Design a protein with these regions (language model features):
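Conserved GNAT acetyl-CoA-binding A-motif
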Residues: 94-104, 248-261
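Conserved acetyl-CoA-binding loop-helix of GNAT-fold acetyltransferases
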Residues: 79-88, 223-229, 233-250, 267, ...
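Conserved catalytic-core motifs of GNAT/GCN5-like acyltransferases
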Residues: 122-134, 257, 275-293
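Conserved donor-binding loop and adjoining core beta-sheet/short helix segment
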Residues: 2, 9, 19, 25, ...
């Protein structure tokens, strides 16, 4: 059997990139959305990545990428992860991974090689991955009847979204750090400039939010779902997600993806019609993890 060719991708490889990932769409949203927004060439700019591909008979058979922010992203069978990681290490010997985004089985293989120090792990979760055909969504009654309404957030909303985001980050990663508010403000401002955040309101008062964190012409991925602790248990988070999905459907999307690690959120998403289609691993590291050479 001929060994696959492993090489760095360029924009000329985009058609093959899309053909490969479109068959693995549910677990490839970050890869596809970023590449659609910023291309496959790398100049260190936002949403770009260094993409390495394994090739067989003129088609991609595996993919590994290191994003501009240091997130390692994979979509490859286990027997190709080693050669792909070796190629990345050889070309980027000083590179650090600040995060890992991959299907759970692929992430497990990579973690065995990266061996992040326990103190550097700020988040490491295997989360159920869910899919919904938007024409089958069960829209919550308060949203259908207008008791709850949603609108797209703007930069003028930062003063109350940022404290929400700080609570979200503390709940997700633990520990309140002095820089969290400034980091949250920068992250939310950048998010609003690129992808929509939707605010759910009742009687003019914001009570929850949900956002798109990746988009394609026919698909969206939902993230950033948050309800303030004192308002939880009232269905606001579920309605916020539904509002974000209605906007996606109105724009032409037919499919939605999301993942979650909490039972309450899972129940809410299943009530909308989401069904589990896999497991996805999300990890964040600070300090970053050096991409170690293979033994």
């Amino acid at each position: 059997m001929t060994a696959p060719e492993i090489r760095r991708l360029s924009q000329a490889d985009y058609p093959a990139f899309e053909r490969f990932l479109s068959g693995r769409a549910e677990s490839s949203m970050f890869l596809r959305s970023n590449a659609r927004a910023a291309g496959l060439d790398y100049a260190g700019e936002a949403f770009q990545a260094r993409y390495f591909g394994a090739w067989g008979t003129d088609e991609l058979t595996g993919l590994l990428a290191l994003s501009w922010g240091g997130h390692l992203m994979a979509q490859a069978p286990a027997d190709l992860l080693g050669p792909l990681l070796a190629a990345l290490q050889a070309e980027e010997p000083e590179a650090m991974a600040t995060g890992l985004l991959a299907p759970a089985d692929q992430a497990a293989w990579l973690l065995e090689r990266l061996k992040p120090a326990p103190e550097s792990v700020k988040l490491s979760e295997i989360e159920p991955l869910f899919r919904l055909d938007l024409d089958r969504m069960a829209v919550p009654e308060p949203l259908r009847t207008g008791v709850l309404v949603a609108r797209r957030a703007g930069l003028e909303d930062l003063d109350f979204i940022v404290p929400w985001r700080v609570v979200y980050d503390v709940e997700t990663m633990g520990g309140l750090r002095p820089e969290m508010e400034a980091d949250a403000r920068a992250a939310i401002a950048a998010w609003i400039e690129r992808l929509p955040i939707f605010l759910l309101e009742t009687e003019g008062r914001p009570v929850a939010m949900a956002a798109w964190n990746a988009e394609l012409p026919d698909m969206v991925q939902i993230g950033g779902v948050f309800t303030p602790p004192e308002l939880r248990g009232r269905g606001y988070g579920r309605a916020a997600v539904a509002a974000a999905l209605i906007a996606a459907r109105d724009r032409g999307a037919t499919t939605a993806i999301l993942f979650t690690h909490t039972p309450a959120a899972e129940r809410a998403y299943r009530a909308l019609g989401f069904e589990q289609v896999g497991l996805y691993h999300i990890a964040l590291y600070d300090p970053g993890v050096r991409l170690c050479p293979l033994p």
